[in-house]
């Protein structure tokens, strides 16, 4: 596993996590 794929995986995790936080914030948790 190279650093590029590791960086992309980390980026996707952060993106999905922030997106779920935005959805939860709009729904009032």
From Swiss-Prot:
Keywords: Chloroplast, Electron transport, Membrane, Photosynthesis, Plastid, Thylakoid, Transmembrane, Transmembrane helix, Transport. The chain crosses the membrane at residues 3-23. It is a single-pass membrane protein. InterPro entries: Cytochr_b6-f_cplx_su8_sf, Cytochrome_b6-f_cplx_su8. GO terms for biological process: cytochrome complex assembly; photosynthesis. It is found in: Plastid, Chloroplast thylakoid membrane. One of its GO terms (molecular function) is electron transporter, transferring electrons within cytochrome b6/f complex of photosystem II activity. GO terms for cellular component: chloroplast thylakoid membrane; cytochrome b6f complex. Component of the cytochrome b6-f complex, which mediates electron transfer between photosystem II (PSII) and photosystem I (PSI), cyclic electron flow around PSI, and state transitions. Belongs to the PetN family. The 4 large subunits of the cytochrome b6-f complex are cytochrome b6, subunit IV (17 kDa polypeptide, PetD), cytochrome f and the Rieske protein, while the 4 small subunits are PetG, PetL, PetM and PetN. The complex functions as a dimer. This is Cytochrome b6-f complex subunit 8. It comes from Chlorokybus atmophyticus. The gene is petN.
């Amino acid at each position: 596993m190279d650093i590029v794929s590791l960086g992309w995986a980390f980026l996707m995790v952060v993106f999905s996590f922030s997106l779920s936080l935005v959805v939860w914030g709009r729904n009032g948790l």
